[in-house]
Every structure is written in structure tokens, then in C-alpha cells.
Amino acid sequence: MAHNPNNNITIVGAGLAGSLLGLILQRRGYTVTMYERYNDVRQIPSAGRSINLVLTSRGLRAMKLLGDDRLIKDMYNLSVPVIGRVMHQDDGSEAFQRYGKDDSEFNLSISRYQLNIYLMNRAEEAGCKLNFGHNLESTDFSSLRHSNETVLRFTHEGGAQTKVIVTGPVLGADGAGSKLRYQLRDAGILDFTEEFNVQGYKEIQFPRNPNKKGGFCLNRDGLHIWPRTTHFIMALANEDGSFTGTLYMDRENHAESFKELKTYSQIQTFFEKYYPEALETLGPMDEIVRQMQENAVGLLGTVRATSYNYGGHCCLFGDAAHAITPFFGQGTNCSFEDCLVLFDLIFEHAPPNNMTTAGLARAFNLFTRERKPNADAIADMALDNFVEMRDRVGDAQFLLKKSVENLLENKFEDRFRSRYAMVCYGGGGNITYDAAQRLGEVQWGIVEDLVTAGVTSAEQVDLDRADALINQRLVPLMAEMQVDLTQIIHSVDDLKVPSSSSRL
């Protein structure tokens, strides 16, 4: 597509969200230049602090904007399907909890590192200009009073500085610690809060087992969780048969914290006490200790901003606008949905052949209005899921309620779906994160009312009463919210990409 010299868009940050939106914009006729703080990740090995991420149809829908089946196919080729949780109890037993109503609804486990490399490559192929080693130091919007120019100042390794004058909007995708977000706050344009969990995380690799089919050292179809109340391990499969494990634990101020687990003896005692069955697949103790001592502790936090944009001049998206904890597996999906919504609005109100500041302002204002309540909702649900995975997944009564929930969504599919299904697979219709949160609270209340004294299995639930409760509590709320549960779609092939006029 021919490019108009007056449709320049600058993106600060070339991570997952920045690279995907850059690719979409460039392919649709805009001229995109990107500035990334770090050196080219394609030349740097993974740094041992990258949680495997989960892709669902909600996030993959953004890739359909390109009308290119290659992207979707490549996502499947780079990933491993995951159909549910496998809970490893402290007595050595296992319990399985399906994600969707059946095995046709699954998530994709993929390496963040590999996905970032893939999206960068595709963005460059499309014509995006990527500039690495550019750490944003300051942003000056003052010249916007008399011109359509913004001054960006970057620092580089060794202290050298670069001044870049850009025309057109600046989009911020520079992550949870976004420099651009801080500068917008310092300029009085918006405010935000950062809430850090007392827990942190470390990556621990489960090596592939050449003696097992495909080399998979654990069941490849599950998200494996070892819940131990004050700490837990999660593990997701990689395509080579290994698993990326993540230990979540207090960073400090606790006898069992990353700060206190330093010596070989302390680490060995900890794993032998709490994770003896995991040791069978984690490999030699020497390797576990090495990873615990060398891998950095990652921070977990939630960012909530009062606004995401400055008129038509600047707009934040992805983690830069609303970082969330990883416990619902929706950080990347939420960011990719941002890309879909933001592109759709820009293309409608400021198309590449007529990109005006007024049109961009309409697009960015609508983006903030639509995405903020949904970002806040998924942030809350992610924090709730942290407590669920740490404390509840090992509880027999909780597992009973989840089996009842699964029974109901199979028996009453058009009127009852789990919160998880609405969150992960509901993006194809009008089931927003906000709607999923509100409906999820009501449907879980129904489950709790059905699991009365004496009920020990899902088969004992009174389905006539369930039908009545659903009609009494859920159906009116769905009608009020204009939610259609039949729009919960896992298959990316069946997803539609709505226009902004039908969405807002």
C-alpha cells in the first residue's frame, strides 16, 4: 500500500504489543518508526526472567486484522495447546481442572522470547523502522502549540544522547515501567498508581526428557501447578518438550522468601520439603541451585492510569497503560486486544490518507473510554486468580465447585459459561472483561448455592434448581448487558473482527 508522508506514527517500545501494532499499522498504510530501549533481543539469549505466556482467541483476534492466515498458523506452530490445570498436591496426588466446557477449548503456551522475535521480524518485513538501544529520557510536547512536532530525547549505552523530532502521534508501548507514562504524569496530563505484590518470581526450567514421547517431561496438555499456600510453582510446556517453570514466593520479610533462600543447603532443603515430586523432573539439584542463585527476581505489579492519552498527540497501550499480574494469563491477550481496538479507532477516525490531529483525538479518547474499565476488570480478576492458584486449587471443596461449574456450562451452554471461558474466549462477541467480571460474580454465586450440604459430586446437583437460578439471576443481567454467550468462540477461524461502529 502506498504511504502518505503525512501519516507518520512513532511507537516507543518494540515488545509484543508495540511490534504487533506497528505491523498492523504499517501493513494498513501508515508509516511506522519504533524506538526500543534495549538492544535487539534477536541478538541476545533469553535472560531467565520471562514467564511463558498464554495466547487465547481474545488476543489472537488482533492478528486477523491483517487478513493473513500465516500469522495464526505460525502461532500454532510455535506453541503447545493447553486444555486445563494439573494440580500437584502436597501428598503426591494430582487433580485436573479443564479450562473450557470440553477439550475443544484450549489455550496456547508460547515463549515470550520467541513471540517477540517473531513479531519484530514480521514488523520489519512490513517496512517498520526499528531503532534499538534508544532509552527514552524525555518527551517535549511544548512545540505542539505552533507545529505538529514532538521532541523525543533518548540516551544510549555509554551516555550518548539523541534528539528526535517526530511528526504525528506518539504511541507508548514501553512496558509496565513506561517512561512515557511517567512523563505524561509529570506534565499533569494523567495520573496513575503502581501496586506491587509482596511476591516475586523466578524462572526455573524443567528440562526435556528424551525417554518420553516428544521429550515432554510432564503432561504437555496442562498448566502444572504445585500449590503450597505461601508459595507455588507453575509450569507450561515448550514446543521442544521442556517446561518453563516459575516459582512465586515472597521477595523478603519471610523465612521462605527469595531473600532468605541463598545457600545450596537452604535451597535444597526448601525443594526437598515442599516440592519432592517436582524434583523428579526438575533435574539435578546443582542445576536447580544454579538457577535459583543466578536468575533475577521479577516484580509483580498492577498499574492503573486515570487516562491513556493526551489529546490526539500521544496514547499509551498495553502494559504501559495498564500492567497486570500474570495469574489469569491475559496480559498479552489484553495488550493484543488493545492493538485491535486502537488500530480500528485510528483507521476509522484518522485514516492514512487523512490523518488529522482532531481525528486522532477522537480515536484516542474513545480508546481510553472503552479500554480503561476493561483493563481495571482484568487486573482485579488476575489478582483474584493469584489467590485461587495459591490457596484454593488444592482444596477439595473448591475443586467440587469447579466441576459443578463445568457441568452447568455443558448443560446450559447458551445461558451459563464460566468466568474463565468468558474472559479467554469471549472476545469474539461483546463479552468484554468488564462484562465477564460482572457475570462471573453472579454465576459463581449460583454454583455456591447449588453445592449444599451433602453434595459430594457434580452429578448430585439439582439441575432443575440450577435452571431456575440461571433464569432468575443470570438471564436478566445478560439481557441488560446485551451479552450473547453463544459468541464465546475458541476457534480463531470463526472469529470476526468488528468495526468500531459496531463495538462502541
Model regions and ranges:
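Conserved N-terminal helical subregion
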Residues: 2-8, 56-203
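Glycine-rich FAD pyrophosphate-binding loop
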Residues: 26-48
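C-terminal helical "tail/cap" subdomain of flavin- and related membrane-associated enzymes
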Residues: 3-5, 344-504
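Conserved FAD-binding catalytic core of PHBH/FMO-like flavoproteins
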Residues: 121, 149-300, 304-310
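Conserved mid-domain beta->alpha element of the FAD-binding
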Residues: 14-23, 27, 296-384, 388, ...
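Generic enzyme active-site microenvironment
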Residues: 34-35, 172, 317
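A short, Lys/Arg-enriched amphipathic alpha-helix followed by its capping loop at the start of a domain
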Residues: 21-30, 62-65, 126
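Conserved Rossmann-like nucleotide-cofactor binding loop
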Residues: 17, 21, 40, 177
